[in-house]
Structure formats: structure tokens, C-alpha cells
Regions:
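Conserved N-terminal beta1-alpha1 strand-loop-helix module at the mouth
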Residues: 1-97, 114-125, 130-140, 163-183, ...
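A short acidic, helix-capping loop that chelates divalent metal ions and anchors anionic groups
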Residues: 42, 48, 148-157
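Non-cysteine beta-strand/loop elements that form the S-adenosyl-L-methionine
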Residues: 99, 139-149
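Acidic/glycine-enriched connector segments
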Residues: 103-104
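Short amphipathic secondary-structure patches
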Residues: 109-110
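Short, flexible/disordered intra-domain loops and linkers
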Residues: 154-166
Length: 244
């Protein structure tokens, strides 16, 4: 059984060397795993390929040291080439996360294989079109946001006019109802957001600074995980929910 068959995106950490306040990536990963995070993505818009590979290797070592290599996937953001190179160097990279303007998911799947995890993010209206028209068997989960504006990724949710469009709880609930794949939501998510976010029926949250920039990353990660576990319900048809 591959990780695709038992994928848990409920507590999703995104990090890179520029997000950890100078602390080792592996240390932040280890603390997040100890708190119960379930999936790790290495992302950097400033690292070259070799540096990103080294970062992935550090994260993979932390996952292995926690004994979680068979249940916590490690993904690379955007860079299919880095994921392939890391695998060639015997680094356990389990897949990639791409946007609709990045390498096509069909290409990612072809090169990484059937057991790899491929995640996709897009603007909400584009996600609707994708769900309606694309071969969803190629994708394992969908990333949606931002819930709030965020300095970590200021262009997240930006429309063609340069405005950042955040996602309402109603919109997230509607997307989850129509999606055949799990949905993870991020963009400035804090522990206080988790109860309402879980009520939408989405399958998880993703964070960067809430853990990576925290004075105590493990405590911050645990607060998020505990809030999710206390509020999430098994998705499916789910209850009818209202917000406000």
C-alpha cells in the first residue's frame, strides 16, 4: 500500500530555509512531527536546486529519525526537477505540490510514478473549472487559500488586477462539497481559525509562519493539531452548516 492510499493532510507544514528564522529546517520538522503534523512540504523561492535538495534531505532525515517515513509524506513545491534529482540521490521524496501555472500534473505523474503524491493549488474559480473538467485521478489533494492575507506568500490569492482575494468559509464549504479529492486550506491560518475552518468540512490546514516563526515551534504546532482534532469531523456528505 502506498502513501496515496492512506494520505492524511490534516496538519500540513510548509517550510524552507527562509521561513525558519535561521533555525535548521530539520529541527522545525522534528518539532512539528512530535506535535502530530502529518505532511511536510519543502518550498523556497530563493534557493537554487542544490540548496533545495539539501533542504529536502534534511527534512527527510528528520522524518526518518521520528520513525515516520512510512506515514508522513515529504513533498517538494513546484520543482519536479529537484524532486527527481533528490530521488536519484536516494532522498525519500514522496511527491510534489504544483500550481496550475507550474509543471502540469500529468507530467508530474508520468515522471514520479503511480505511487507518488501530487497536490495542486489554484484560485477558487479556477479550482471549480478544474474539478469539472480535469482528470482528477492524477491529483491526490487540492490546496486552497488564502483564508487571510499573509506576508509569507503575498501573491497568494492575487487576481489579475493585483488584488488579494481571501476565501470565505462558505466558499470553502462549497468547494469541499463538489470536490472528489481532499482539500487543505491555508493562508495566515491560526489556532483560533481552526474550529470554523473544520466546520466547513475541509480535510486539513496548512501553515508556514504559525509554526516556523513561533518562539516555540512544537508548542505552536501542538496547539494547531489539538484544535483540529477537537473540531474536525469525518468528511463526506457532512452536515449542512451555516456561518456567521
Amino acid at each position: 500500500m502506498s502513501m496515496r492510499d492512506n494520505l492524511d493532510i490534516s496538519a500540513y507544514l510548509v517550510l524552507g530555509p527562509e521561513t525558519t528564522l535561521g533555525r535548521p529546517v530539520g529541527d522545525i520538522v522534528a518539532q512539528a512531527l512530535a506535535a502530530g503534523f502529518t505532511i511536510i512540504q519543502v518550498r523556497s523561492k530563493v534557493c537554487g536546486a542544490r540548496e533545495l535538495m539539501a533542504c529536502a534531505e534534511e527534512a527527510a532525515r528528520a522524518i526518518a529519525a521520528a520513525g515516520a517515513q512510512d506515514r508522513v509524506p515529504l513533498l517538494i513545491d513546484d520543482r519536479l526537477d529537484v524532486a527527481l534529482a533528490a530521488r536519484d540521490a536516494d532522498v525519500k521524496v514522496d511527491g510534489v505540490h504544483v500550481g496550475q501555472s507550474d509543471v502540469p500534473v500529468e507530467t508530474c505523474r508520468r515522471y514520479l510514478g503511480e505511487d507518488a503524491i501530487v497536490g495542486l493549488s489554484a484560485r477558487a474559480h479556477e479550482m471549480r473549472d478544474y474539478i469539472a473538467t480535469a482528470d482528477m485521478s492524477l491529483v491526490d489533494y487540492l490546496g486552497v487559500g488564502p483564508l487571510h492575507e499573509t506576508a509569507t506568500k503575498p501573491d497568494c490569492g492575487m487576481d489579475d488586477d493585483g488584488r488579494v482575494i481571501t476565501r470565505s468559509l462558505e466558499e470553502l464549504a462549497d468547494l469541499r462539497r463538489i470536490s472528489p479529492k481532499p482539500i487543505v486550506v491555508g493562508g495566515g491560518v491560526k489556532a483560533a481559525d481552526i474550529p470554523a475552518l473544520a466546520k466547513t468540512g475541509v480535510d486539513g490546514f496548512f501553515v508556514v509562519s504559525a509554526v516556523c516563526a513561533a518562539e516555540d515551534p512544537r508548542a505552536a504546532a501542538a496547539e494547531l493539531v489539538d484544535a483540529w482534532r477537537a473540531n474536525a469531523y469525518v468528511t463526506g456528505d457532512g452536515p449542512a452548516v451555516t456561518f456567521g
